[in-house]
Amino acid sequence: MSRLHHQQGGQPSQRMLRVAELVRHAMSELLTRSDINDPALEGKVITVPDVRMSPDLKLATVYVMPLGGENVTEVLAALDRHKKLLRGEIARRVSLRFAPDVRFKADPGFEYSGKIDALLSSPKVKQDLEVQDLELKDSGCAGAPAKTGPAGDGE
């Protein structure tokens, strides 16, 4: 093949992004309706923040996270057990030549946001933010630009 499936820079193609979004919607609807009878999934709200497709559209990597981030490995194992059922349901909802094989992974964004929150609440960062607030108050800037009229006369 002379053409690459990826755009320059390793970015996914528009088709890959479009199919990934269709699969994400179908998967989140399936997990919301709770058609899966598994004790590990009962009463859990599972979010599907991202799906990434392979260039040939035959593999969908579904990133999931249970609400609250609890029992992630248990939820991933339960979804893997019902992979065949979920693949069949996706095939019915998304019209593709081949139903993509489904792989489940924990969403790394949840862990990343936790690290950012911990960093922002650290004593050093709080101290720096307090210093910035004091400097703004001392300089008379409230952080918002002054309103001026069209002639710049304050009205």
Swiss-Prot record:
Keyword Ligase: no
Key words of the record: Cytoplasm, Ribosome biogenesis
Record-annotated membrane-spanning stretches: none
Predominant cellular place of this UniProt entry's protein: cytoplasm
GO biological process: maturation of SSU-rRNA
Subcellular location per the Swiss-Prot or TrEMBL entry: Cytoplasm
Its job: One of several proteins that assist in the late maturation steps of the functional core of the 30S ribosomal subunit. Associates with free 30S ribosomal subunits (but not with 30S subunits that are part of 70S ribosomes or polysomes). Required for efficient processing of 16S rRNA. May interact with the 5'-terminal helix region of 16S rRNA.
The protein's name: Ribosome-binding factor A
The organism of origin for this protein: Methylocella silvestris (strain DSM 15510 / CIP 108128 / LMG 27833 / NCIMB 13906 / BL2)
